[in-house]
Amino acid sequence: MEFRVKNGKKNKKNTLRFMACTAAVMVVCAGTTVWDSWRVAGTAYAAAAQETSAGADAAVVQAPTFDPARFVLPDLAKVLVAVEGTGGSTCKVYAYEKIDGVWKLKVTSDGYLGANGMSNHRHSGDKTTPIGVFCMNTPFGLKDAQAGFPSNYVKVDSSYVWSDISNTLEKDSSGRQAGERVGEEKYKGYYDYVIDAGFNTQGILGQGSALFLHCAVSWETSSSGCVAIEEEKMAEILKLYGAYGDGACYMALAPA
């Protein structure tokens, strides 16, 4: 899915949500910025976020390892979904829960991401998955909620659209609003269960649209930029999200 901002206007609600979540506000790696250390592997989006939300609680990358200690998150963070790019469009996904101050591994899954791999210079239509740390939001899907799912999980149908204007999920019974009709039959399998990762919530022109964590299908080996994992594991992550709710669940994406 790709995002277009009409007339270059930013969405106020998304701006506030971005500031509240403070995704990848300050990024450092062994005393230097990840932008300096990982210029090839990349974290440009996180560096841009630093300029936008300076002074808020920070999500910091400390060391080049997928140990969750690498990611220093706001105190309110209780769930971390770490996406490790393993070459091309393949990835490993690890979901951790913070229990008594210690990150515990709860879910692991193979997965796939953008057809052109990971990028620190993502732009609309390039089929890459952005690198960075983001605050997850908006759980939804074509299937009914399971016990333990977030209370704000939305079962979507064809009247729901991921809006091109607001970059959020909206009800549009008129069918006139521009965007992706996420509840249509063609998304069965893919969008059975979904969480928005929180990428480009400010609607920066040209950066691309929503970054979804959604279900993988057997006939695909890559996406347009989203991260796809096994449906069973997707449901487990939704239950972790449900235990804490909005603002407590983060996604971190980077190459191995």
Please describe what each predicted stretch is:
Residues 1-53:
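Gram-positive cell-envelope targeting signals
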Residues 229:
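A conserved hydrophobic position in a structured secondary element of the catalytic/binding core
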